[in-house]
């Protein structure tokens, strides 16, 4: 028996009205203006022949640069800005990309023997027009904003770049061994250097911008070194449980799980996650220890000129659970967008972590005669945790390309290195970083030793001094501006969905860490309490800071982008709530420590 036509029309009208209501809700949120920090205009110099470089703190990667790392022609950058703001494919295709080409071979003419010997091609800017795209759910990409990025001469920027150099110098340190005697010299050096900087040793002042106040970090200790500041990130082991543990497998009720656990593991399923009837491992490929990139000025300049070194990193045989700073940097090099959060969701579901008690149909089936799946169940959260990712990416792409256009840390390291070498000759090429060079003197000396060792290993028996920021990736940063971070905005959005669905206050009964010697999990000596929300927040910080550890993002990129992603996810949850017939709310603990109901 069919459904009467009148009922179908009524349903169609109700469906239309629901969509209109969602659109009206999105419109009612309003638009938050996006403001840059003013440096693009401050360092604009249309006449480079007078000796002042142009756009030195803007993202110019891909355009031709001079021997100091400044763009040769400011008009190239202005054309770049016009093209990305228009989104016109032809305008983008007509931009100057990379160096001059050899008239005979047609290949780019690189500065370094390495790039020329590999016959490298150029790489293009990544999705520069994505922020111009419209979406059909959640906040419009251009309706939410990030605050202005820290300026080049600020105490915050000096602290950020100091932290990145220190992370780079400690890439072989194990997360579980920060307090080990064997690492004491490096760890104490890092702590002392950071605590000696104004950003860490001076409290926020009345009248400071709110965004700066919320990013402000106090005294650095062994317990919070290189950690995030989201609620839970400073509690327990450095690594979130959800990036190292596994889950119960199918057949676990009859002992089927045991076949997947290594004989020497402390258990928690040995880092193996049930993905349906197959398993996926939390283990990561082992990047060659001590192998850093872009430590030579000519190679660095080639990368700024668009040399495509992707794929030229090297690895040890096998894989292991994340153990070192370099391991985490490797994890975030090739992760599949929402991988960490889908994995976390699979772990939470397989281990029967309860949903938020406010979500419908949480009683025993014998009481409400229903189980959850399409709505408020496994299928719902598995779909939604991935669905928010590209919406968040569009929002951050708009901030990256169309608003802030912040230079990557590798380029800041270039300014510092060039100026440090000039200072030793009594000169100053980029006086804007004179203070940074002075305050980072001890860190830069260690960086020079590390870079010299790397450059000798790369075949230069007598390398020139280099104070560049060592990169974990052969290609350096991705081909888009630094502020904000794609990894961080996705982290913020996906973790927000997970916290909305699962019982955030649920306590984790056993805490694990990765063994310092063997590829296995061991029970942690931590005696405090970890919660689902805290470990999900820590997961977001781990992934976002992993990009900092690789040398491709700053702390402010990571922190502000997580908050941006949260806004996207909240908007989607609000709009989708209009589609449900059940009367309920999501209870969401936000990244600022407050709790809201959706």
UniProtKB/Swiss-Prot annotation:
Its cofactor is Ca(2+); vanadate. The active site is at 480, 487. CDD domains: PAP2_haloperoxidase. One of its GO terms (molecular function) is bromide peroxidase activity. Keywords: Metal-binding, Oxidoreductase, Peroxidase, Vanadium. It catalyses: RH + Br(-) + H2O2 = RBr + 2 H2O. It comes from the Eukaryota. Changing residue 480 to A: Shows 4% of wild-type activity. Binds 1 Ca(2+) ion per subunit. The binding is important for enzyme stability. Binds 1 vanadate ion per subunit. Optimum pH is 6.0. Ca(2+) binds at residues 361, 363, 365, 368, 370. Vanadate binds at residues 400, 408, 485-487, 547, 553. InterPro entries: Br/Cl_peroxidase_C, P_Acid_Pase_2/haloperoxi_sf, V-haloperoxidase. It is an enzyme of class 1 (oxidoreductase). Its EC number is 1.11.1.18. Belongs to the vanadium-dependent haloperoxidase family. Homododecamer. Catalyzes the halogenation of organic substrates in the presence of hydrogen peroxide. This is Vanadium-dependent bromoperoxidase. It comes from Corallina officinalis (Coral seaweed).
